[in-house]
């Protein structure tokens, strides 16, 4: 496939971008004069007479659209450099992503944190409940509980 055929297979948005900003020109990675040939269309550039910065020719949204299309068609290396922008794309975005504190291992609410301790206390209390009731009701009740336990045990095994 020749370069001409490959260029014709690109989407209209990419074609128009490369016609307006040909990849043969080495674009500046930093802001330059608006009249300079190598003025980067993705960066704000300074007007030589007024010394004021002009907005970039392509906004961040349009730059992102062009970059994503170029990435899909494998021609992103022909785009002007965008290193000093804070915009990250695709793999870079997910590789450099820092997770918020507590996302991987969430701390939980107070009632969730104390749940295991609470269940252990409950089990211990259930084991000691007969002794507690016997101490409050007296020895007569304690003897009755012991008889009930003996009768409940199955001895025919």
From Swiss-Prot:
Pfam families: Mitoc_mL59. Keywords: Mitochondrion, Ribonucleoprotein, Ribosomal protein. GO terms for cellular component: mitochondrial inner membrane; mitochondrial large ribosomal subunit; mitochondrion. GO terms for biological process: mitochondrial translation. It comes from the Eukaryota. It is found in: Mitochondrion. InterPro entries: Ribosomal_mL59 (IPR037507), Ribosomal_mL59_dom (IPR040922). One of its GO terms (molecular function) is structural constituent of ribosome. Its main location: mitochondrion. Transmembrane segments: none annotated. Component of the mitochondrial ribosome (mitoribosome), a dedicated translation machinery responsible for the synthesis of mitochondrial genome-encoded proteins, including at least some of the essential transmembrane subunits of the mitochondrial respiratory chain. The mitoribosomes are attached to the mitochondrial inner membrane and translation products are cotranslationally integrated into the membrane. Component of the mitochondrial large ribosomal subunit (mt-LSU). Mature yeast 74S mitochondrial ribosomes consist of a small (37S) and a large (54S) subunit. The 37S small subunit contains a 15S ribosomal RNA (15S mt-rRNA) and 34 different proteins. The 54S large subunit contains a 21S rRNA (21S mt-rRNA) and 46 different proteins. Belongs to the mitochondrion-specific ribosomal protein mL59 family. PANTHER family: 54S RIBOSOMAL PROTEIN L25, MITOCHONDRIAL, LARGE RIBOSOMAL SUBUNIT PROTEIN ML59. Present with 1550 molecules/cell in log phase SD medium. This is Large ribosomal subunit protein mL59. It comes from Saccharomyces cerevisiae (strain ATCC 204508 / S288c) (Baker's yeast). The gene is MRPL25.
């Amino acid at each position: 496939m020749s370069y001409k055929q490959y260029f014709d297979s690109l989407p209209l948005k990419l074609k128009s971008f490369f016609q307006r900003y040909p990849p043969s020109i080495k674009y500046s990675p930093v802001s330059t004069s608006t009249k300079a040939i190598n003025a980067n269309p993705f960066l704000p550039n300074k007007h030589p007479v007024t010394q004021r910065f002009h907005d970039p020719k392509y906004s961040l949204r349009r730059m992102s659209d062009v970059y994503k299309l170029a990435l899909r068609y494998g021609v992103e290396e022909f785009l002007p450099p965008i290193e000093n922008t804070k915009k990250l794309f695709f793999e870079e975005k997910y590789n450099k992503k820092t997770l918020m504190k507590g996302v991987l291992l969430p701390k939980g609410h107070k009632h969730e944190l104390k749940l295991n301790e609470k269940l252990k206390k409950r089990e211990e209390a259930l084991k000691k409940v007969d002794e507690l009731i016997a101490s409050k009701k007296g020895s007569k009740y304690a003897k009755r509980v012991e008889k009930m336990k003996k009768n409940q045990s199955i001895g025919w095994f």
